[in-house]
Amino acid sequence: MADQASSTITIDATPEAVLAVIRDVEAYPQWTNGISKAVVVEPGKDGPAKVTFTMSQSGLSDEYTLVYDWKADGVAWELTAPTKLQKSQTGSYQLDPAESGTKVTYLLTMDIKVPMIGIMRRKAEKMIIDSALKELKKRVESLR
């Protein structure tokens, strides 16, 4: 069963600067916890159209491919096929100008194959989202 989780953070940078970091998927292994490899399989006009990621975290590893839909105010993605750990995944970053930078909302819907009690699964998803937003904020603000 797929669960949806979301969280929002404000980053002290323009939406364009935030989107530039999100678009640079091949750099994710440098600053994103758990991602060891990111390969652009298919480039796109506004950003990578298809990317294969290799992840390893908490004793679990997986390789998965996402297709992206880039917009001026964010990006959405979807898992191309089930993997060892995931049945499905959709997500998005929505960027909105804010008084003190950019408000970034991360939405993630995942259906995982690893059996987990509902409350534990939701807690894990919330942890993934919060960690991703904190890492994104740190990366963007370090490049200013």
Please state what every model-predicted region is.
Residues 1-46, 135:
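Hydrophobic ligand-binding cavity/cleft-lining segments
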Residues 18-22, 28, 51, 77, ...:
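Hydrophobic pocket/interface hotspot
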Residues 23, 90, 119-120:
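Generic recognition of short, well-ordered alpha-helical segments
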Residues 29-30, 40-44, 54-101, 109-111, ...:
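Hydrophobic-ligand binding "helix-grip"
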Residues 37-41, 50, 124-126, 141:
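Juxtamembrane/interface motifs at transmembrane-helix termini
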Residues 109-144:
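A conserved amphipathic terminal alpha-helix motif
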